[in-house]
C-alpha cells in the first residue's frame, strides 16, 4: 500500500549551504546584440549599416512583411558588426556602446491620447514588437482590433 504525502503551505527543507545573501552591482557591458530570431515570424530588413552611429531608441531593422514593426537600439553607440548566416540571413546585430544619446518621445496625458496616437507611439518607440497576439504568440498587427487584452 502506498503512502500519500500531502504538503500544505510549502515545505522547509533544512539543507546545508545555500545562496549568499549579498547583492552586487552588475557590470555594464560595452557590446550589445539584437537577435531577430527573438521575434517570431519577423523577416528583418536593415535600416543601418556597419559603422553607423545609432541613438538609444533609433530603429535598427524592421519587419519586411509589416513595416510598422520596428526593432530599436537598446543603447546608443556604433554598429560594430552585422553577422549573417546562410543565404545572408541576419543572425544578429552587434552594437558597441558609446555615448548617451536618447531619442525622446513627447507623450501627453493618457486621457488626451486617441487610439491612433497611441498606436503611432507604440510603432515609433519600438514597443509594438513586444506586444504578442494569441494563439500563436506572433507580433500584434495594428490593423486588427483585439477581442480581449491580457496583461
Q: Model-found features: residue ranges?
A:
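Mobile cofactor-carrier "swinging-arm" domains
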Residues: 1-15, 80, 85-87, 91-102
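N-terminal, Lys/Arg-enriched amphipathic/low-complexity engagement segments
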Residues: 1-47, 62
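Generic structural motif
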Residues: 38-42, 54-57, 66-81
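Acidic, glycine-anchored pre-beta loop/turn
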Residues: 48-54, 83-86
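Short hydrophobic beta/alpha edge segments that flank linear recognition/processing sites
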Residues: 54-68, 91-99
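Buried, small/hydrophobic-residue-enriched core segments of structured protein domains
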Residues: 85-151
Amino acid at each position: 500500500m502506498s503512502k500519500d504525502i500531502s504538503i500544505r503551505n510549502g515545505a522547509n527543507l533544512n539543507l546545508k549551504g545555500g545562496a549568499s545573501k549579498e547583492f552586487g552591482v552588475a557590470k555594464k557591458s560595452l557590446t550589445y546584440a539584437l537577435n531577430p530570431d527573438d521575434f517570431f515570424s519577423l523577416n528583418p530588413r536593415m535600416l543601418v549599416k556597419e559603422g553607423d552611429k545609432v541613438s538609444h531608441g533609433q530603429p535598427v531593422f524592421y519587419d519586411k512583411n509589416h513595416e510598422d514593426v520596428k526593432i530599436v537600439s537598446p543603447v546608443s553607440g556604433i554598429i560594430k558588426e552585422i553577422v549573417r548566416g546562410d543565404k545572408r540571413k541576419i543572425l544578429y546585430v552587434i552594437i558597441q556602446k558609446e555615448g548617451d544619446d536618447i531619442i525622446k518621445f513627447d507623450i501627453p496625458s493618457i486621457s488626451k491620447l486617441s487610439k491612433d496616437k497611441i498606436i503611432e507611439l507604440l510603432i515609433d518607440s519600438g514597443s509594438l514588437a513586444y506586444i504578442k497576439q494569441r494563439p500563436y504568440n506572433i507580433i500584434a498587427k495594428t490593423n486588427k482590433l483585439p477581442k480581449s487584452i491580457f496583461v
